[in-house]
Amino acid sequence: MDDYLKIEKIGEGTYGVVYKGRNKTTGQVVAMKKIRLESEEEGVPSTAVREISLLKELQHPNVVRLLDVLMQESKLYLVFEFLSMDLKKYLDSIPSGQFMDPMLVKSYLYQILEGILFCHCRRVLHRDLKPQNLLIDNKGVIKLADFGLARAFGVPVRVYTHEVVTLWYRAPEVLLGASRYSTPVDVWSIGTIFAELATKKPLFHGDSEIDQLFRIFRTLGTPNNEVWPDVESLPDYKNTFPKWKSGNLASTVKNLDKNGIDLLTKMLIYDPPKRISARQAMTHPYFDDLDKSTLPASNLKI
């Protein structure tokens, strides 16, 4: 900890307070996340430290870099590269009646997919993607933050400040209690974020797990074993769910063209193995007119 100077508190993350800091030797400005763990007495579980140390290997232009893992008494500090703006703040700053430039929506979505594909190829899931942990700089670059923390520390029901963790971006298989899930959970989250980039409004903004499910069902239809094999045997599926018919995504997400709606539809397929993968999504015609050579990861092969 002696290498870093805390400058100011900049926010409250899922796991604890986030500070802006500076490396005393190099002068690099950093974000320092203090991880508050449930069982303070026992100190930091070694499994969590191992998990987190692996994340230092995730180096990609669209993934926020974990620079250092520090222990101080029973507290764990994660030191990340610093970016001052997140996607939620940016969307909130767009004046009423105005929307994000469609080319920027496309560029951001493509970069998010690049970052997620890089991590998925290394068998790391995010599990908790949302606009608050997508960070942006002033050069049009977007980066995914908090990768792998869900696996190391679990996804709490409430933030340590007792604020409820948002369900808006959570995949239906997770909401329905599936014990095993994989990379498609992140693709679902990115789909809901894609819609929000276009409209500035969350696509499914439920205030409880059942409300969240019903908002999804009202738009996409209530799933059954026909459209999603074995969904009816998931722990939290009830045969008493109202049977909504599939609606029309295009009427809900008005600012996307035909290709955009087609890609969004494929990202929001109920059956996880049928849901488009990040790699497949990147070759979708929606991105045909995007100049990928200007993107930060353009020279990388995944």
Curated annotation (Swiss-Prot):
Keywords: ATP-binding, Cell cycle, Cell division, Cytoplasm, Cytoskeleton, Kinase, Mitosis, Nucleotide-binding, Nucleus, Phosphoprotein, Serine/threonine-protein kinase, Transferase. SUPFAM superfamilies: Protein kinase-like (PK-like) (SSF56112). Phosphorylation at Thr-14 or Tyr-15 inactivates the enzyme, while phosphorylation at Thr-161 activates it. Plays a key role in the control of the eukaryotic cell cycle by modulating the centrosome cycle as well as mitotic onset; promotes G2-M transition via association with multiple interphase cyclins. During G2 and early mitosis, CDC25A/B/C-mediated dephosphorylation activates CDK1/cyclin complexes which phosphorylate several substrates that trigger at least centrosome separation, Golgi dynamics, nuclear envelope breakdown and chromosome condensation. It is found in: Nucleus; Cytoplasm, Cytoskeleton, Microtubule organizing center, Centrosome. One of its GO terms (cellular component) is nucleus. Its EC number is 2.7.11.22, 2.7.11.23. ATP binds at residues 10-18, 33. This is Cyclin-dependent kinase 1. It comes from Carassius auratus (Goldfish). Forms a stable but non-covalent complex with cyclin B in mature oocytes. The gene is cdk1.
